[in-house]
Structures are given as C-alpha cells and as structure tokens.
A protein has these predicted regions:
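Catalytic nucleophile-loop/oxyanion-hole region of alpha/beta-hydrolase
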Residues: 86-92, 116-146
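Alpha/beta-hydrolase fold nucleophile elbow
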Residues: 146-157
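Short coil/turn segments at beta-strand junctions that form active-site/ligand-binding loops
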Residues: 77-78, 104-105, 148-150
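Histidine-centered divalent metal-coordination motifs
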Residues: 84, 115, 156
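Conserved alpha/beta-hydrolase
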Residues: 97-120
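Short beta-strand element of the alpha/beta-hydrolase
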Residues: 76-85
Length: 162
C-alpha cells in the first residue's frame, strides 16, 4: 500500500520535463518501480514493447503527476488522454492503459489535484476549474512537445465532466 508520504517522495523524485523518452537511462526510483509493480503498470511484452516515463506538470498551484506510456512509433495510431474519476488515481487504470497500448495508442494519464500522487488536499477542490486547469496544462505541454496525434480523450465520472 502507498501512503501520502510515499506519494510525496515519488512526486519529489520526478522530473519536470518527462515527455522526452530519448534518454536510455533508467531513471525510475525504487519507490516508483514499487508503485508501478503494485498497481500492475509495469507492462512488459504484453503491450508490444511500450516505454514509460513519469514526471511533473506544474500549474503553479499544484504539482500534477503525469504518466506517459508510449508504443513503438511504427505501431502508433495516436494518443489517448485518460482522465480518472473522483477518489480514483492512475493506479486503478492499468486495464484501460494496457488496452489502449495494445490497440496502438500512446497513453497520457495524470492524477487530478488531491488524488493519487499529485499534490493538494485529498479529494478536495475549490472549483472544477482547478481540475480542468490541470488538464489544460498537460495538453499544452503535450502539444509543445509534439506528442503523437490524433488525440482522443477518455474520461470516467469526474474525468468525463472535465
């Protein structure tokens, strides 16, 4: 099980620019590796050889933890942005991530403010604009770094309302 202290340690260990997979270095801390293993997010072979990186998207108010799962270029059909529901987090979406990867979609998924590994009071928000602001920040970073298109968005519960 992962505590808020673990979440803070993982968050503090992540880079700000994480959409760059050109580095051959393994930069996952043991705690991040444990998190990925615990939630079944270590996809090896069954997804066609995807790569993973994680990092921070900061919007000034929150540190948003974002995961980027990339299928090999020759298989890419586009990018699926997954938005989770209230009280959920990335770790609960392993089956959906795997399914998208198997279909040839790169996946971008992030924890909403106050959820999962992202900063903020637990499941507490002043306005839905804070959630949509976090998503827009992720989209801006993805656009600036030319994340593979076309883009699709899949949202569940609160994620669908964003």
């Amino acid at each position: 099980m992962f505590s808020r202290d673990n979440a803070e340690q993982i968050r503090d260990s992540l880079p700000l620019n994480f959409f760059n997979l050109n580095s051959n270095k393994e930069e996952k801390t043991p705690l991040l590796q444990s998190y990925l293993q615990y939630y079944g997010l270590n996809f090896t072979g069954d997804d066609g050889g995807s790569k993973h990186c994680a990092g921070i998207v900061s919007n000034g108010e929150f540190k948003i933890v974002c995961h980027y799962f990339v299928v090999p270029l020759e298989r890419q059909k586009g990018t699926a942005f997954l938005l989770h529901g209230y009280f959920d987090h990335t770790g609960l979406y392993g089956h959906m991530i795997r399914h998208c990867l198997q279909l040839g979609y790169t996946v971008v998924i992030f924890d909403l403010p106050g959820h999962g590994l992202s900063s903020g009071p637990i499941a507490e928000i002043d306005s839905f604009r804070q959630y949509s602001g976090a998503f827009l920040r992720v989209l801006r970073q993805a656009k600036g770094l030319k994340v593979n298109q076309p883009w699709i968005v899949i949202g569940q519960s609160t994620g669908a309302a964003i």
